[in-house]
């Protein structure tokens, strides 16, 4: 994410080291260097698009890194909070979760295993392609040739 100067100054005041924007393709290498990652969804996603997780949740779990997230509504029950990742309702709980992950290799392994299991079972690219094709099949048959050109 790209932040305005004012936001970067606020982060610095709180001791947060911002290393700059990274392309999605770089996420696996970045995640591989750390014990856990934190997800704080933007207000846009939590208020205007409630129930829809950001791509970060999928990326982190697919990359096999323990995830601690600020709250967001999982209205479709895509993931298993407390098993695939941990929710933190406030800064103190975030700190507790991160300390627990840091100190407990079994907790880290369990979160990684569960997160990967959920992604592999329900959220792979193949799953999304199959889902898209099911949607296309339900559309007006007259529209299917046009859609076939778009999908191809």
Locate the predicted segments by residue.
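Nucleotide-sugar donor-binding catalytic core of glycosyltransferases
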Residues: 1-62, 66, 72-78
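Generic anion/oxyanion-binding catalytic loop in active/binding sites
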Residues: 16-19, 49, 83, 104, ...
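Hydrophobic, well-ordered secondary-structure elements that form the walls
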Residues: 60, 85, 124
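Short, contiguous hydrophobic alpha-helices characteristic of membrane insertion segments
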Residues: 67-70, 83-89, 135-148
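C-terminal amphipathic helix plus adjacent low-complexity
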Residues: 95-152
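Residue-level signal for the nucleotide or nucleotide-sugar donor/cofactor binding architecture
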Residues: 55, 89, 123
């Amino acid at each position: 994410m790209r932040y305005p100067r004012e936001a970067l100054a606020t982060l610095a005041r709180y001791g947060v080291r911002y290393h700059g924007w990274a392309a999605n393709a770089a996420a696996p290498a970045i995640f591989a260097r750390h014990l856990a990652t934190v997800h704080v969804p933007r207000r846009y996603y939590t208020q205007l698009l409630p129930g829809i997780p950001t791509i970060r949740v999928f990326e982190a779990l697919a990359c096999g890194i323990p995830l601690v997230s600020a709250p967001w509504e999982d209205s479709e029950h895509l993931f298993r909070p407390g098993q695939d990742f941990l929710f933190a309702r406030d800064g103190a709980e975030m700190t507790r979760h991160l300390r627990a992950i840091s100190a407990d290799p079994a907790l880290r392994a369990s979160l990684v295993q569960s997160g990967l299991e959920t992604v592999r079972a329900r959220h792979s690219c193949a799953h999304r392609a199959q889902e898209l094709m099911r949607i296309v099949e339900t559309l007006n048959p007259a529209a299917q040739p046009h859609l076939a050109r778009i999908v191809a």
